[in-house]
Every structure is written in C-alpha cells, then in structure tokens.
C-alpha cells in the first residue's frame, strides 16, 4: 500500500513539476511479466493454503530474482538503480530471517498491527531477527489511511519508482542529464 500511495503521489505531482503524463504511455517497458510473476509468488506464499512454512519462505525469496529480471531489462530508466538497491536490501533482510521480513514490534504497534498474527506473514516480529535495521522499522500510524509498516528498502524502492515516473515524464524534479539520457535512446 505504501508503494501504491507513492506512485499515485508521483503521478499527481508530475504536472506540477512541468512534466507530461502522456510520456508514461510512450515508454516501452521490457519484461513486464516478471513483475506479475514475482508479485504472484509473494501473494501465493502468503495466501495459498496448505503450503509449509519452508515453501512459503522459499517463494518469498525466489520472488526477488524474478523481479530483478524486470529491473535489469529496464535499467536505462531513471531511478532503476535506486529501486534495485531497495530490493536488494529487502531481499537481504528476508533471506537471513528465513523468508520473513523482520518487523519492529514498536512499528507494528504504531501501525495498529498484531505483532504475532497467526499463520505465515511476509513481515512479522521475530524473536531474534538478523539485520533488524533493514526490516520494517517505520510505520504509517494506525489513525491514518493505509497504515502499515515498511523498511528502508521499501523507501528506496518508492523513491526510485517516483524518480522513474518523473524522469520519464520530463519533470523538473529529475536532473536534465537523466532525462536527456532517456531521450537519446527512444523506443528502447
């Protein structure tokens, strides 16, 4: 939800920053299927009944290399290295914690979420988390819409996606060098 809110905000601010929203439909994204497969793996890991925790954890970790296929194929777009860094930090935190993103109990409480919800969770308070600072340590307060927890990796992914949207649209918020680099490779 955090990423969706950032994408909506980025799109809404493009015209305010002198960009053209029409440019979004002109960009040719490659390997879009990887987004659907990667996110599908994550959703299936959380929602499919009858899977062992080990299989669920493996599916969560496996989603990241699949999503990386999209990132590598679209590396020329502004912001993709930032998205990749955020994804790598999330993958690291998840991989060293058995397929679960560690969540700060304080962040979960602040977002109004259960620290120990039943069943497999993609983000949960763990007894002895590794690299806890890379986990979901930030929160949107429970009193706000879309309250949830998120990580520094999520922040970097959101910033990278916003940078990509503004860069593709020619916004003044993205340095002209990044825009001209994208424009020098039309149809790529």
Q: Model segments located where?
A:
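Extracytosolic (periplasmic/ER-lumenal) interhelical loops and adjacent juxtamembrane/interface segments
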Residues: 103-149
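Membrane-interface loop-to-helix entry segments
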Residues: 55-62, 147-159
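Transmembrane alpha-helical insertion/packing segments
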Residues: 1-62
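Hydrophobic transmembrane-helix microenvironments that flank and shape a buried ionizable site
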Residues: 39, 57, 87, 133, ...
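Interfacial segments of alpha-helical transmembrane regions
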Residues: 63-97
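Long, low-complexity, intrinsically disordered cytosolic termini of multi-pass membrane proteins
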Residues: 181-188
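Membrane-interface capping segments at transmembrane-helix boundaries
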Residues: 20-22, 166-181
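A cytosolic-side transmembrane-helix exit/cap motif
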Residues: 78-83, 100-110, 177
